[in-house]
């Protein structure tokens, strides 16, 4: 089978290897689609956390079960599935509290063990979620990022009627816009430097989309009091955006840190947080929102067509990574069709 391998920082190679055999409690999955996440790009550049070289990347995927090793999951053979990247123990205090991304023995598909940028992969049966037959596999590869967005919105406690601004309109940012609406909130503005991504946000009904220049969102909120948000969700990870989120949100409001970049230190003035009595809260990963994300996508309540902007065969991995890294041609998500 073909498999993309990250061997070292900025060194990706397409390999041919045997189809892996599932260990006890695992399933063999034939991958259909895998989208390229911002964390994959940071991993490629060597500036991510908790990863191991060499490894097959990829954690936003869909596919179908070919085989299982053991009695559990036998009913999944032949079914279309997605899967949680989080390989947690299920028994530690963090897992028991519903925060598996903080597991004391955490592993992650596509980071510490081989992921979905391959024609086949092995996945713990416990991580698999079956898909309804009506949900296309291309759409289903966005279950994981949608779960990330739902988890972030819920961690910030967005309630009906609240106004929310989103910083960054890449894949996660555009899903945050729709997740806020699912919870009854109103997205009043998006800040994004790439024109095509701003256009995608406007197409989703966001009333205002400003550029990524420092101060653009703050200027908007000062010129239009109705645009002052109760919550700002920062999804870009850029250092200046964190401080701008703190300045743009209303006094007593909440700031959610969803994106981050290890290679650059964020700048946040504590006095703004203290004087405005703000709540700043972080969110990472899908949490426990995987099943809901499957149901939401199957219902058609969230549109992912604007996210999946550039399709590639695995043979074209170099171009896929380049387009995603440069955000060329309005790229929001490069994705691989593993069955092309």
UniProtKB/Swiss-Prot annotation:
Presence of keyword Metal-binding: yes
Q: Which residues bind Zn(2+) 1?
A: 37, 59, 144
Give the pathway.
Metabolic intermediate biosynthesis; 2-deoxystreptamine biosynthesis; 2-deoxystreptamine from D-glucose 6-phosphate: step 3/4; Antibiotic biosynthesis; neomycin biosynthesis
This protein's record includes keyword Signal: no
How many cofactor units bind, and how? Binds 2 Zn(2+) ions per subunit.
One of the entry's Gene Ontology molecular-function terms is: metal ion binding
EC assignment: the record states: 1.1.1.329
Q: Which reaction does it catalyse?
A: 2-deoxy-scyllo-inosamine + NADP(+) = 3-amino-2,3-dideoxy-scyllo-inosose + NADPH + H(+); 2-deoxy-scyllo-inosamine + NAD(+) = 3-amino-2,3-dideoxy-scyllo-inosose + NADH + H(+)
Q: Which cofactor does it need?
A: Zn(2+)
- Where do transmembrane segments lie in this chain? none
Q: Keyword set for this entry?
A: Metal-binding, NAD, NADP, Oxidoreductase, Zinc
Record-annotated residues binding Zn(2+) 2? 89, 92, 95, 103
Q: Which PANTHER family match?
A: ALCOHOL DEHYDROGENASE-RELATED, L-THREONINE 3-DEHYDROGENASE
The text of the family note is: Belongs to the zinc-containing alcohol dehydrogenase family. DOIA dehydrogenase subfamily.
What role does this protein play?
Answer: Catalyzes the oxidation of 2-deoxy-scyllo-inosamine (DOIA) with NAD(+) or NADP(+), forming 3-amino-2,3-dideoxy-scyllo-inosose (amino-DOI).
What protein does this entry describe? 2-deoxy-scyllo-inosamine dehydrogenase
| Organism of origin | Streptomyces fradiae (Streptomyces roseoflavus)
């Amino acid at each position: 089978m073909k498999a993309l391998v990250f061997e070292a920082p900025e060194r990706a190679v397409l390999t041919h290897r045997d189809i892996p055999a599932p260990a006890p409690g695992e399933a063999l999955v034939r991958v259909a689609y895998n989208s390229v996440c911002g964390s994959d790009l940071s991993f490629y550049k060597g500036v991510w956390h908790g990863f191991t070289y060499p490894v097959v990347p990829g954690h936003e995927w869909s596919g179908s079960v070919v085989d299982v090793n053991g009695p559990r999951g036998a009913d999944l053979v032949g079914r279309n599935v997605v899967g949680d990247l989080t390989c947690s123990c299920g028994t530690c205090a963090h897992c028991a509290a519903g925060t598996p991304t903080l597991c004391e023995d955490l592993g992650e598909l596509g980071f510490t063990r081989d992921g979905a940028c391959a024609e086949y992969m092995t996945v713990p049966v416990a991580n698999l979620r079956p898909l309804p037959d009506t949900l296309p596999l291309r759409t289903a590869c966005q279950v994981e990022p949608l779960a990330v967005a739902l988890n972030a919105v819920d961690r910030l406690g967005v309630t009906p009627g609240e106004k929310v601004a989103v910083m960054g309109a890449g894949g996660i940012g555009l899903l945050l816009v729709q997740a806020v609406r699912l919870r009854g909130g109103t997205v009043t503005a998006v800040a994004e430097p790439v024109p095509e991504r701003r256009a995608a946000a406007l197409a989703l009904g966001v009333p205002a989309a400003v550029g990524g220049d420092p101060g653009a969102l703050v200027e908007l909120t000062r010129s239009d009091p109705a645009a002052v948000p109760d919550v700002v969700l920062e999804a870009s990870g850029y250092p200046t955006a964190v401080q701008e989120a703190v300045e743009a949100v209303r006094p007593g409001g909440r700031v959610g840190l969803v994106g981050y970049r290890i290679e650059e230190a964020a700048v946040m003035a504590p006095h703004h947080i203290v004087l405005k009595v703000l709540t700043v809260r972080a969110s990472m990963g899908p949490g426990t929102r995987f099943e809901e994300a499957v149901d939401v996508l199957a219902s058609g309540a969230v549109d992912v067509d604007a996210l999946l902007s550039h399709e590639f065969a695995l043979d074209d991995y170099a171009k896929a990574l380049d387009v995603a890294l440069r955000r060329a041609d309005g790229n929001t998500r490069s994705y691989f069709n593993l069955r092309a």
